[in-house]
Amino acid sequence: MGYRDALYNKTNYNSRGGDFRGGRSSDRNDYNRDRNQGYSHGGLRGRHDDGPRELIKPDWESELPNLPPFEKNFYVEHEVVRNRSDQEVAQFRKESEMTITGHDIPKPITTFDEAGFPDYVLKEVKAEGFDKPTSIQCQGWPMALSGRDMVGIAATGSGKTLSYCLPGIVHINAQPLLSPGDGPIVLVLAPTRELAVQIQKECSKFGKSSRIRNTCVYGGVPRGQQIRELIRGAEIVIATPGRLIDMLEAGKTNLKRVTYLVLDEADRMLDMGFEPQIRKIVDQIRPDRQTLMWSATWPKEVQQLARDYLNDPIQVQIGSLELAASHNITQLVEVVSEFEKRDRLVKHLDTASQDKESKILIFASTKRTCDEITSYLRQDGWPALAIHGDKDQRERDWVLNEFRTGNSPIMVATDVAARGIDVKGINFVVNYDMPGNIEDYVHRIGRTGRAGATGTAISFFTEDNKSLGASLISIMREAKQNIPEELMKYDRRPRGPHPRYGGGYGRGGRGYGGGRGGYGGRGGGRGGRGGFNRSRDGGWGNRR
C-alpha cells in the first residue's frame, strides 16, 4: 500500500491543496483537552502573561503514556528498489562514497520516482528541473521516510536541506491539523539567521501545494512579526536556538506538537556555543519524536549530542570522515608578507573580473580588516561590500542581496557573518586572512565548487599562520593540489622524490580556475581589465 492509499484510509480529507491528512477528530480533541487542562509539555514556571519564565523539563516518564499517538513511518519500498540485489546496492554505495551505520537500513533509491513520494511532492520536485537525487538524498530519503532517527554527514551544498524537508512535508500531511494555540509539527534548528532563511525558502517552495505554513524565528530583528506568525500558527518553524528560547520563555509558542525535529549543521551550532540552548529546547519535545541530525563533520561533541537525543539511529556519511576539501576546488596558496596582501588581492581580482558572472567572497579575520579592505577596494573602483557582526540586520540583508544578485559581485566577510550564507555561483573564495584552524579553512573554501561546479580558492599564508602549515599541506595533498615550495617547509612528512603534486598555478598545468590555458597556465594571461569591475563613478566598465 502506497502513501496515498495509506492516507486515504485515514478518513480525514483536508482542503489544504487536496491532500489527505491523517488523524481523527478524537486526536484533535485529545490535544485540546491536554491544552485546556494545563498540559505541561513545553511548559513554563508561571503563567504566559507574567513575562519570561524559566523553561522546565516535563516529566516524560509519566506524561508520555498519556500523549496522543502519531505516525512517522511512511516508506513503501518501490518494486525496483526491492528487486535491487545486495551486490548492486553495495556497488552504488561504493561509487557514491557512502558509508552506512546501523541496522535495518533501507536500500538507497536512484531516481525521484523510486523514493515513493506522493504525487504532490513529486510534482514540486520535477517543476524545479532537478535531474536526479544527490547521494545524500538517495539514502537519506528512505531513512527519513521510514520514521527512523538518523544522522546525515555530508558537505555543505550536498542537498541535505531537501533530504529532510520533503519527508517533513509528508510527515505533516499525516498528522492532525493544528488547532488554535498549537505550536509547530516540524521544528528545524539552524545556527544562523542566513541559513534559517535559506531553509525557509525551500520549505515554502515545496510545501505550497499542501498549503503548509512556515515561519522563521531568528535574532537581530524586532520580534513583533515573528510573534504574530507564531500565534497565527505554522506547521514548520525554522529557528536559531537563542531566539526560539526567548519565544518559548515568553509563552509565544510551545513545542507540544513537535514530532519531527531537525538539527541542521549541528557541528556549527556547537562551534557557536549553542549546545546549552539546544539541550534546553530538545528537552521540551516528546521523546518519541523523530529526530534527524545533519552535520558536515562528526566531532566527539556532536557524537555525544546524538547519543543523548537520538533513539537507535541509523547513519549515512558521504565521503570520508577525515577532514577533506572538495576536489572540485582549485586551491591556490601564496606565501606572502602582510604588506603584500593588497597588491596580490587586486591582481587576482583583475583576473577574476574577466568573467562578468563571477562572484568573489573574501574572508578577513576581523571586522576592522573587513571594513578596511572594502574601503580600499571601493576607492580603487571595485564593487565591494562588507558584511560582519557590527552591521545591523537590515544592512546585512541588503549586502547579501546585492551579492546574490550580482549587483555587488565582491563581498568581504568575517567568519561569523558568513556562516549559513548560501549563495549560488560563487566562483572564487579569497582567504585574505587565514582562519584560526583548518576546519574553518575547509568550511570557507567550500563556499565555491558546490553542486558539481568548479571553483577556485586563493589563500594568503603568512609567517603568523605557520601553525596551520602542516594541516594545510595535508588538505591540499589529499585533494591532489599543487603545493608551493615556500609552504613545504612546514611539512611534517618526510620529503620524498615527489613531495608536491604537479600542475596548477603558475606551472602550466590546470591553471587558474582549473581550465587549460588559464591564469598562470600554458598560453594563459591576465588579459584586459574589462569584466565586472566598476569605474569610480559607479558605472560598469573599465576601472580608471
UniProtKB/Swiss-Prot annotation:
Entry keyword annotation includes Acetylation:
no
Describe the function of this protein: ATP-dependent RNA helicase involved nonsense-mediated mRNA decay and ribosome biogenesis through rRNA processing.
What Gene Ontology terms describe what this protein does at the molecular function level?
A: ATP binding; ATP hydrolysis activity; G-quadruplex DNA binding; G-quadruplex RNA binding; mRNA binding; RNA helicase activity; snoRNA binding
Q: Where is the composition biased (Basic and acidic residues)?
A: 18-36
Per the Swiss-Prot or TrEMBL annotation, the motif DEAD box is positioned at 264-267
Among its keywords, does the record have Hydrolase? yes
* Residue ranges of domain Helicase ATP-binding in the record: 141-316
The protein depicted here goes by the name ATP-dependent RNA helicase DBP2
The residue ranges of the Helicase C-terminal domain are 331-491
Return the annotated region ranges for RNA-binding RGG-box.
501-528
Localisation per UniProt entry: Cytoplasm; Nucleus
SMART domains documented for this protein: DEXDc (SM00487), HELICc (SM00490)
Q: Which GO terms describe its cellular component?
A: cytoplasm; nucleus
Motif mapping: Q motif: 110-138
Give the InterPro entries listed for this entry. DEAD/DEAH_box_helicase_dom, Helicase_ATP-bd, Helicase_C-like, P-loop_NTPase, RNA-helicase_DEAD-box_CS, RNA_helicase_DEAD_Q_motif
Q: Where is this region: Disordered?
A: 1-54, 490-544
Q: What class of enzyme is it?
A: hydrolase
Q: GO BP, one example?
A: nuclear-transcribed mRNA catabolic process, nonsense-mediated decay
Stretches of Gly residues bias are at 501-531
What UniProt keywords apply to this chain's record, in alphabetical order?
Answer: ATP-binding, Cytoplasm, Helicase, Hydrolase, Nonsense-mediated mRNA decay, Nucleotide-binding, Nucleus, Ribosome biogenesis, RNA-binding, rRNA processing
Which residues are recorded as binding ATP?
A: A154, A155, T156, G157, S158, G159, K160, T161
Q: How does it assemble?
A: Associates with polysomes.
Would you say which domain of life the source belongs to? Answer: Eukaryota
Q: What is its EC number?
A: 3.6.4.13
What's the domain remark here? The Q motif is unique to and characteristic of the DEAD box family of RNA helicases and controls ATP binding and hydrolysis.
